[in-house]
Amino acid sequence: MSTSLFANVEMAPRDPILGLTEAYNAEKNPAKVNLGVGVYFGDDGKIPLLAAVKQAEQARLAAQPPRGYQPIEGTPAYNGAVQGLLFGKESDIVGSGRAATFQCLGGTGALRVGADYLKALLPGSTVYISDPSWENHRQLFEAVGFKVDTYAYYDPATRGVNFAAMKASLAAMPPKSIVLLHACCHNPTGADLTAAQWLSLIHI
């Protein structure tokens, strides 16, 4: 009788966020609210199909593009459109070739690819995540061997960003530090920087 190679593999701990969803599904209270996974639900409790997504799906289906392998960086036209959306079509960042864009498998997958790349470039650096942050971010960067620390971000008293403390934290970091910023929909607080604060941050 052979023993399975996986016989002694221990079960990983259950994901706490997905566990909240399981508890939500089991809850009988009709007024319950799901504050677990960061997914938008309509008033009917269902995930809506956004009109823009439906339109994009229909346009792609109508065009019937080839189904071969994509270039390593992904679809060039899509990457260019993303750069134009983020930086502006006439941005010098785009025009001078300083923006690099490639497609990845979702948000966490993209972070892992970035973490591996940064580990090869800056192996001795520390990664800084916001306080608080989504805990998976810490685990992801620690898994590739980075030391992970935090920078000041949220102020519970104002329920917003403590921008002065955040700027002080960033200014005190050593050279070649790696800072993980949430561009929007900060996880888990929902507190985002204003356009003026982003511009101020660029100069640190």
Predicted stretch roles:
Residues 13-106:
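N-terminal small-domain helix-loop-helix segment of the aminotransferase-like
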Residues 19, 81, 110-114, 165, ...:
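Well-ordered alpha-helical segments embedded in enzymatic catalytic cores
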Residues 92-104, 109-112, 116-181, 188, ...:
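PLP-dependent aminotransferase-like
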Residues 202-204:
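Conserved small/polar residues in nucleotide/adenosyl-binding loops
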